[in-house]
Amino acid sequence: LTEGISPENQEVLKKVVAKYGQQIQFYTVDKKVFANCPISRHITLATYFRLIMTDILPKSVEKVLYLDCDVVVRHSLRSLWDTDIKSYAAGVIPDMSIDDIRIYNRLQYSPSLGYFNAGVLLVNLRYWRENNLSESFFEIINKYPERLRYHDQDVLNIVLKEIKLTLPMKYNVQHGYFFKDPLISRAYWDEK
């Protein structure tokens, strides 16, 4: 999803993925859809593009593995991709600030429902389409923009709070964990 990667850069990317026997498709997004979305100095409107995947990607695409551009992949993602999420909107990984009560107070839901990082998402597009989640995302953006400190990540957490599958932390270990070891929930300590 892009707001305008130049044709020259598209060709460069196509050559890179071709080396690995893969293909790449570019889908242009109209930024006007995001006119009411809050942004900040380091977060652009592009962060919201994932909220409209159902409107842009072909209906034949029913599942997407979304990775932020700063994610480092060290092993095969096959086991993540093969995770059964048919009954869920998405497979998600807990955020390093999962125990921060201020997040739940700001978003106004129970800490028992958890908070996830949106940098790695296994998305069930069929579920999103059937339940019109894109509309729900924009309802939250329009109704509560002041609550959205972490932009689309907060939107996703609010809408998906009861319809997500929590996945092992090994799929998205954020750098902050290395500085805050005592804050890692004990439930994850034995994970490889």
Annotate each predicted stretch with a short phrase:
Residues 1-192:
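Glycosyltransferase catalytic domains, chiefly GT-A lineage
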